[in-house]
């Protein structure tokens, strides 16, 4: 998916990023072994200002969200609305000094953000984009990208990675481009695509180097 995206869109002009690999942000317990990925310098999420939007009530959301019609399947429709109700209750505010840059939906069980979970939930939540910017949930992963392009698949609410980048369990299937591509095909948001492209390209290069 990322290869397809890369073939369709040009990389933006570099944007300056001043977070060094020696920053306390990464809390390295070992010698600095980062091999710098130049595309990370274009990752504007790493130095973005924090935003903390709050969603409205479920009653307000129901007036905006798509209302399904499925004759003879009232129970399924009730489940649909219940899913939205639960989802809105799981929108969290970023903690101070966590390095997260925006409010996010957190469907996980332990307060952490999971790359897989949030990739899939944003695929669903894009239908509620007029009510709340759910897609920005993924911005918090991008904000935590390491200087070599690595992004941990699970990150605690305080912003710390759950796994070191040399741990083979620190990554999984790269679902981020899938979510972003679906969002783009629905909304045609060129600005967002241009912002996430260098981030995803840097992560793809890290995966290619370290997981193949």
Give the ranges of each region predicted by the language model:
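Short, well-ordered helical secondary-structure segments
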Residues: 2, 101-103, 108, 174, ...
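Bacterial N-terminal signal peptides
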Residues: 2-11
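Hydrophobic alpha-helical segments with strong N-terminal bias
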Residues: 8, 101-102, 162, 173
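Hydrophobic alpha-helical elements and their junctions with loops/disorder across both membrane
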Residues: 10-14, 90, 94, 184-186
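Low-complexity, Ser/Thr/Pro/Gly-enriched N-terminal "stalk/linker" regions
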Residues: 16-111, 136
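Aromatic-rich carbohydrate-recognition surfaces in CAZymes
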Residues: 111-212
């Amino acid at each position: 998916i990322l290869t397809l995206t890369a073939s369709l869109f040009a990389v933006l002009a570099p944007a300056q990023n001043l977070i060094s690999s020696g920053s306390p942000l990464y809390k390295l317990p070992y010698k600095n072994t980062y091999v710098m990925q130049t595309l990370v310098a274009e990752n504007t999420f790493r130095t973005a200002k924090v935003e903390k939007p709050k969603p409205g009530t479920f009653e307000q959301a129901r007036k905006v969200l798509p209302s399904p019609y499925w004759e003879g399947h009232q129970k399924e429709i009730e489940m649909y609305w219940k899913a939205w109700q639960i989802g809105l209750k799981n929108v969290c505010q970023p903690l101070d000094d966590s390095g997260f840059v925006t409010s996010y939906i957190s469907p996980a069980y332990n307060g952490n953000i999971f790359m897989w979970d949030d990739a899939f939930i944003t695929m669903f939540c894009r239908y509620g984009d007029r009510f709340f910017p759910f897609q920005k949930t993924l911005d918090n992963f991008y904000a935590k990208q390491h200087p070599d392009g690595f992004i941990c698949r699970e990150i605690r609410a305080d912003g710390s990675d759950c796994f070191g980048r040399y741990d083979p369990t620190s990554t999984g299937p790269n679902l981020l481009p899938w979510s972003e591509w679906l969002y783009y095909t629905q909304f045609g948001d060129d600005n967002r695509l241009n912002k996430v492209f260098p981030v995803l390209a840097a992560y793809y290069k890290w995966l290619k180097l370290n997981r193949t």
